[in-house]
Amino acid sequence: MSLIDQAREQMAKTVENTKENFSGIRTGRANPALLNGITVDYYGAPTPIKAVASIGVPEPRTLSVTPFDASQAGAVEKALRNSDLGVSPNRDGNVIRLTMPELTEERRKEYVKLAKGKAEDGKVAVRNIRRKTKEALDKAVKDGEMGEDEGDRLLKDLDKVTKSVTDEIDALLESKQKEIMEV
């Protein structure tokens, strides 16, 4: 596998990571990914909520959480109540409902700022991958493993890949901003 292919693969993982980070940012709509960071004290062991309960979206602004083990409904409710989501869980038997409140303009702007920060983190990671790959290319040229023309051509390819990936991150950010600001 060439250096450029390795860089492309690492950058693709960075884009996926950025998408995952974006999915955890609240918008006006309910999204099961909002609960990804929440852990439940499941028989004494911290366990991700999606491993102990099914999460559904019955209405655009409501999440329903149904524990697989009915005896753990209290622990799941407690984990949701102690989370930083800013919503109060309503328990109805074994089903726990979370109603997402409308976001204020101020909160929307905070979330846009957060999204911009996560996008910038992704771009920094891409630039670091580019830098490391360029260093490896320069070393290969210096050590005589490839000619200067080959090194220059690969560097241009690397720059094209880097540009396309940063453009993709920008497009993801723009899409997320629209989603957040949508009332």
UniProtKB/Swiss-Prot annotation:
Cysteines engaged in disulfide bonds, as pairs: none
InterPro entries xref list: Ribosome_recyc_fac, Ribosome_recyc_fac_dom, RRF_sf
Subcellular location: Cytoplasm
Main subcellular localisation: cytoplasm
One Gene Ontology cellular component: cytoplasm
Coiled-coil stretches noted in the UniProt entry, renumbered to this chain: none
Signal peptide residues on this chain, from the entry's feature table: none
UniProt-listed GO biological process terms: translational termination
Family membership noted in the UniProt record: Belongs to the RRF family.
Purpose: Responsible for the release of ribosomes from messenger RNA at the termination of protein biosynthesis. May increase the efficiency of translation by recycling ribosomes from one round of translation to another.
Protein's UniProt name: Ribosome-recycling factor
Annotated source species: Bifidobacterium longum subsp. infantis (strain ATCC 15697 / DSM 20088 / JCM 1222 / NCTC 11817 / S12)
